[in-house]
Curated annotation (Swiss-Prot):
Cofactor binding summary note: Binds 1 zinc ion per subunit.
GO function term, MF aspect, one: carbohydrate derivative binding
GO annotations of cellular component type: cytoplasm
Catalytic activity: 2 D-sedoheptulose 7-phosphate = D-glycero-alpha-D-manno-heptose 7-phosphate + D-glycero-beta-D-manno-heptose 7-phosphate
Cofactor(s) it depends on: Zn(2+)
UniProt-annotated location(s): Cytoplasm
Main location per the UniProt record: cytoplasm
Annotated SIS domain residues: 37-192
Protein name (record): Phosphoheptose isomerase
Record keyword Zinc-finger present: no
Pathway entry: Carbohydrate biosynthesis; D-glycero-D-manno-heptose 7-phosphate biosynthesis; D-glycero-alpha-D-manno-heptose 7-phosphate and D-glycero-beta-D-manno-heptose 7-phosphate from sedoheptulose 7-phosphate: step 1/1
Native organism: Escherichia coli O127:H6 (strain E2348/69 / EPEC)
Amino acid sequence: MYQDLIRNELNEAAETLANFLKDDANIHAIQRAALLLADSFKAGGKVLSCGNGGSHCDAMHFAEELTGRYRENRPGYPAIAISDVSHISCVGNDFGFNDIFSRYVEAVGREGDVLLGISTSGNSANVIKAIAAAREKGMKVITLTGKDGGKMAGTADIEIRVPHFGYADRIQEIHIKVIHILIQLIEKEMVK
């Protein structure tokens, strides 16, 4: 009944991944991002992550795998997803939704820390404001974006962009693969 649809969805996902994989710049950006994160951890820094909707879930998943575990039994790494409901509702009410991430970065971000901002469109105003706040704090910035990078294009130290112009779910599928690879590389780098 839905077998053709299922095959089409899986083929499109595989094609999106294959296109991403063809660009060596993506491979280099992932490696650079992992090394930047590991260097921050080794120097006593932390990573803050943020995004909206599915990207918010990815930001939480990234932090959870770092503080908990991914594949290896090892110490937890300092990672915080900006996901505290009381913070988000307070700042959203008192300042506005566009400030929910930047206020948190202002409060706990420090020089030597890293911000991971995730947006499939690259146009999330609250993530863009978080990037600006991170810059003011002297933090490094890594972004996971899609399409043409949107307004976030060129704002990060390292941008990992999925140049897919269809639905956001294909971009999110690559983002979660990138997140898992980042964690795997961080685990390898931290035991050196």
